[in-house]
């Protein structure tokens, strides 16, 4: 309920006879029209005594499928049969599953290193899944879909362009007509911005020293600029959600020294009301500023990094912590980081190198995720 009572878990729980472990109990892929039903992708785990049998029902189903789930009762209807090689599904915000991601295995059960994308063309027509693209591991030659916008009947997908990931729109009417919609000459375009229950795509994001957003929707472009002027100390502004008609928006604003606050913005009155802080216990606590820097590697290559110094303290003679990010396919970015701030508050300078092998800087820097070039990546650290 709205007051937080009568919680109903929607995930699929494992039974006692499950044949394998499962760390994923479901993900909402389409919120539909607000009728109380949602589309959820769910990992079906067969029962140990049903494997290979002809037992009917859910006990022998295996793999990722999609169910239509009643959020009031928890009852579910199967709408996409489980596939043991499926890894993701994308819906169009109008209750339709449009794209399926599959990672096939060879005869020994090992992944082939290929990802296959299929789609349902507009209107279906009973033809089943149609080819969308085939992508090879650590290659950006193929279209890799991120989202589907049902209001325009297009998928948004990334593909390599001049050594960087760019964003394209792809018509789902069967023509697969493709159009470039966003790119950056220095870094990869990494994600799209969606709004509302239907997941309408309104922009694309990429990270230079800070995360940037190119808004396709002119109204949201103007609104984002207005919010940036109204909240100059928290420039990391993003639209988190909206009500059905987008008359009220949930907005987040933060920075490197501010964990952030969630606001409700009412379009009719242009009123911005603070709702809750992301980390209220840190209110009034001094934070160290995060600065984008460059330093020369052993071979002279300039490596991007972030440097955070203790707040209000000396800038020289400090003990330092070098904190490389994890992976695979990852990078740090400017903004609040609780672990960095913990070390800075303890008197350390914190350096976060974006070593060769980090994602987001293009194919040349990614270097196949430092595969067979780990010595170079480690030397950058």
Model-inferred region functions:
Residues 1-249, 254-258, 265-268, 285:
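Beta-propeller folds
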Residues 11, 205, 276-279, 354:
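Residues at the C-termini of beta-strands that transition into short coil/loop
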Residues 144, 153, 165-166, 247, ...:
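Structural beta-strand/beta-sheet cores of well-ordered domains, especially the beta-sheet scaffolds
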Residues 258-293:
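An N-terminal hydrophobic leader/cap segment in hydrolases
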């Amino acid at each position: 309920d709205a007051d937080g009572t009568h919680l109903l878990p929607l995930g699929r729980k494992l039974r006692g006879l499950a044949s394998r472990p499962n760390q994923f109990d479901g993900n909402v892929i389409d919120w539909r029209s607000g009728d109380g039903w949602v589309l959820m992708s769910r990992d079906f785990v067969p029962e140990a005594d049903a494997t290979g049998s002809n037992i009917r029902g859910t006990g022998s189903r295996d793999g990722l499928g999609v169910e239509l789930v009643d959020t009031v009762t928890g009852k579910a209807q199967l709408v996409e049969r489980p596939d043991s090689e499926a890894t993701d599904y994308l819906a169009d915000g109008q209750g339709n599953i449009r794209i399926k991601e599959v990672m096939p295995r060879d005869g020994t059960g090992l992944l082939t290193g290929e990802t296959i994308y299929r789609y349902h063309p507009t209107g279906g027509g009973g033809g089943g899944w149609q080819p969308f693209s085939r992508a090879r591991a650590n290659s950006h030659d193929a279209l890799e879909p991120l989202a589907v916008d049902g209001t325009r009947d297009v998928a948004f997908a990334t593909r390599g362009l001049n050594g960087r990931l760019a964003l394209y729109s792809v018509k789902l009417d069967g023509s697969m007509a493709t159009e470039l919609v966003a790119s950056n000459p220095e870094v990869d375009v990494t994600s799209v911005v969606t709004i509302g229950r239907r997941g309408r795509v309104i922009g694309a994001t990429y990270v230079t020293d800070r995360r940037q957003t190119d808004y396709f929707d002119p109204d949201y472009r103007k609104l984002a600029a207005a919010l940036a002027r109204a909240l100059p100390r928290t420039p990391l502004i993003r639209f988190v959600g909206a009500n059905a008609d987008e008359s009220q928006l949930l907005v987040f604003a933060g920075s490197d020294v501010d964990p952030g606050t969630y606001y409700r913005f009412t379009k009719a009155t242009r009123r911005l009301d603070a709702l809750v802080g992301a980390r209220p216990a840190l209110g009034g606590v001094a934070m160290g500023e995060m600065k984008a820097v460059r330093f020369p590697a052993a071979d002279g290559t300039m490596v991007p990094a972030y440097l955070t110094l203790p707040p209000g303290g000396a800038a020289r003679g400090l003990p330092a912590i070098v904190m490389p990010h994890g992976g695979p396919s990852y990078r740090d970015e400017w903004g609040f980081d609780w672990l960095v701030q913990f070390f800075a508050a303890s008197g350390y300078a914190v350096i976060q190198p974006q070593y060769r092998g980090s994602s987001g800087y293009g194919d040349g820097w990614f270097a196949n995720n430092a595969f067979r070039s780990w010595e170079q990546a480690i030397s950058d650290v």
